[in-house]
Amino acid sequence: MKTLAFAGSKGVAALGMLAIAAVLSRVFDKVDYATYRQTLLVYQFVGPLLGLGLPAALFYFLPGETSRLRSVLLENLILLGTLGGLFSLFLALGGNRLIALQFSNPELEETLLIFALYPVLFLPTTAVSAVLVVQGKVKWLLLHTLATRLARVGLVVGAAWFCAAGPAGAVGATTISGIIVLSSGLFLMLRAVPREKGSRPTLTGMSSQLKYAVPIGLALMLEKLAMGVDQVLVSMLCSREDFAVFSNGAMEIPFIQMITVPATAIVLPELVALYKSNDKKEALLLWRKAARKVAVVLLPIGGVLFVIAPELMTVLYSEDYENSAGPLRVYLLLLPARLVFFAAIFQAASRTDLILKRAVGTLVLNIVVSYPLVSYMGFQGAAWGTVIVFWGYVFPYCLCHCSRLLETRWFKLMPYRQVGIILLLIAAAGALAALARAYLALSSAFLEGAATATMMLILLLPPLALLFWKDLSGYWQAIQKRLSGKEQGPPAGC
């Protein structure tokens, strides 16, 4: 249940962002919409760096602690609040003008000043998931995420749609929603963690958390920066209209983490146990089995989205954003490499240094490859740059090191044959559905997309059920075990 709540909260957050994007794409013109998205991009890009891995450190410091639980939490929140406050000061004292100049968008000067309070409000709330999961309050986490995201959607949509407040109003509503998130988060965290007599936050405790969090959090920070550099490059090198189109297509598909996070968390404890007992053959079999189960669920969904991408972008964001289908389709090419988190093997082998090295290489290469591609191809180049780096560096890097850790050959690490069969089925179903769609006289993008998706699923589901029924049923049974509470430890990381 912990894992599903963790994944579910991420899915709810992603759906909330999707709802806001869908409304603002229709209410604002592309220039105003780009201003809103660029304002949020500043925190989305810098936020992981500011956090220093401190929220994840609570998974280590809270379990087993009896005498200083509340103090450990307060030390973590003080550090997060201080780091968020420093960035808020940076924005308020001239950083807004500097960023507006780099993005060639003078309107950012006003919106970033309005947004300046947001980092100090929101950064402490990044600890909510860790605290509530460790303390066994998973229902609280889901309710908190659902309520605060609904509040944010209501505030932003109300400001933009009903009040016609423009991007400054939408950003102001986002900042106000930060107060709601902080209030709810602090209330729940303090309720979940009991107070002790005679125990207070100390500088020594803060220092201990920093020493633990920074090395582990550094890899996570760099990987998030690496995967977000595409939007920064498009903001700097392309027009605001192009950034608006790109940002909608470059969205994180909500279902990806909702599928892969539970699957990885199901596998990770057993994978660690097998690795520690030096049973690497069984660990490899477990790994391949998990990859097959996720592939049967994830790849068909991605295939359907690939085929109906233009209709999906039109339905979500209006006809003005039909070209957002280009970046979406390019990023969907990453799905076969994201069937599982390779970091699970690195964690099982206690080789987090490999995650850090991968992150550094990904960040540097993404900048080096994407910059000229964006200059030459426009915003499409950013998507292709990320895909080239992922398939040309990240995937081979993971295959090489994971095969060594499991003492096998790279071509035995993944279920390539099964993945290939699924991709062939998707390609055949997609081609037939696209051919049939050409003969349908449907005037609505929604009807056209729905009809195409339905045809693809009708063509896909029977052969998938016939060939991979065991994997599908096994995946469902594993999730049912999680729902029954038979799990240990925190949710798996990336």
Mark where each language-model region is.
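Signature of the first transmembrane helix
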Residues: M1-A56, L83-S88, A92-L93, V153, ...
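N-terminal membrane topogenesis motif
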Residues: M1-M17, R70, L74, L108, ...
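Helix-loop junctions and terminal segments of transmembrane helices
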Residues: M17, A22, L50-T66, V133-V134, ...
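Interfacial/gating helices of multi-pass transporter permease domains
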Residues: V23-F45, E109-E110, P167-V171, G205-I216, ...
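Membrane-interface junctions at transmembrane-helix termini in multi-pass inner-membrane proteins
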Residues: F61, L121-H144, L332-G361, P372
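Hydrophobic alpha-helical transmembrane segments
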Residues: E109, L113, L142-A192, Y212, ...
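Interhelical loop/hinge segments that connect adjacent transmembrane helices in multipass membrane
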Residues: K139, P167-V171, G185-M227, I266, ...
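Membrane-proximal transmembrane or re-entrant/amphipathic helices at the cytosolic face
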Residues: R409, L432-C494
